[in-house]
Amino acid sequence: MATNKLRGLYAITPDRADGARLLADVEAALAGGCRVVQYRDKLSTMPEQVARAQALRELTRRFAATLLINDDLALAALVQADGVHLGKDDGNLVVARAILGPDKILGASCYADFAAAEAASRAGADYVAFGAVYPSPTKPQAANATTELFVRAKAELPAATCAIGGITLDNAPPLIVAGADLLAVITDLFSAPDIMARAAAYQRLFEEAHS
């Protein structure tokens, strides 16, 4: 798997009752330069999830973007997604890698636990996610992940790193400086009055940091 795909804004879909609005919002993020999208849906029925995931697959292909599915290997296979993201209770990473094969992306939630990130990397994870890096309305009980985790991971692990939790344009730069390859954002992106402009602003943070 080409890990150079794993850099920049990582848009995680919000819970939307309106599927058409969800697709329009994701399209706006892609138009703003976002190239990694995770479909996460805790509310819809399975038929709705399949339909939305298929539509997102078509949309991300149009923008040459990466589509990951949250917590569902079967759905990822069904829609030919680029990979999956698994939490600590969502399945064995070694088994997931065996099912996915070598060319799909496997991401793992590691919270504030560097040992978990080491284990995930050994199991074949392409990226490890630390968070919440800031207080998060989506996961208010999440452990606090410090920037030191990203510094250490960059030095010691082959896997890319993802920051998640309470990220905004204002508090994002220290995470990139510390070594975060991906910034996973829900609220600050999809609640923005102009999603395309907000996505573009996040992408510029990476361009400026690596220029």
From Swiss-Prot:
Q: Which residues bind 2-[(2R,5Z)-2-carboxy-4-methylthiazol-5(2H)-ylidene]ethyl phosphate?
A: 136-138, 166, 186-187
* Any single Gene Ontology cellular-component annotation: cytoplasm
Give the required cofactors. Mg(2+)
Q: Which reaction does it catalyse?
A: 2-[(2R,5Z)-2-carboxy-4-methylthiazol-5(2H)-ylidene]ethyl phosphate + 4-amino-2-methyl-5-(diphosphooxymethyl)pyrimidine + 2 H(+) = thiamine phosphate + CO2 + diphosphate; 2-(2-carboxy-4-methylthiazol-5-yl)ethyl phosphate + 4-amino-2-methyl-5-(diphosphooxymethyl)pyrimidine + 2 H(+) = thiamine phosphate + CO2 + diphosphate; 4-methyl-5-(2-phosphooxyethyl)-thiazole + 4-amino-2-methyl-5-(diphosphooxymethyl)pyrimidine + H(+) = thiamine phosphate + diphosphate
- Which keywords belong to this entry? Magnesium, Metal-binding, Thiamine biosynthesis, Transferase
Example GO BP: thiamine biosynthetic process
SUPFAM superfamilies recorded: Thiamin phosphate synthase
Any one GO molecular-function label of the UniProt entry: thiamine-phosphate diphosphorylase activity
Binding-site residues for Mg(2+), renumbered to this chain: 71, 90
Q: Would I find Magnesium among this entry's keywords?
A: yes
Stored Pfam families: TMP-TENI
Q: Does the keyword Kinase apply?
A: no
Q: In which pathway does it act?
A: Cofactor biosynthesis; thiamine diphosphate biosynthesis; thiamine phosphate from 4-amino-2-methyl-5-diphosphomethylpyrimidine and 4-methyl-5-(2-phosphoethyl)-thiazole: step 1/1
Task: Tell me, in a sentence or two, what this protein's role is.
Answer: Condenses 4-methyl-5-(beta-hydroxyethyl)thiazole monophosphate (THZ-P) and 2-methyl-4-amino-5-hydroxymethyl pyrimidine pyrophosphate (HMP-PP) to form thiamine monophosphate (TMP).
Full protein name: Thiamine-phosphate synthase
Q: What is the lineage of its organism?
A: Bacteria, Pseudomonadati, Pseudomonadota, Betaproteobacteria, Rhodocyclales
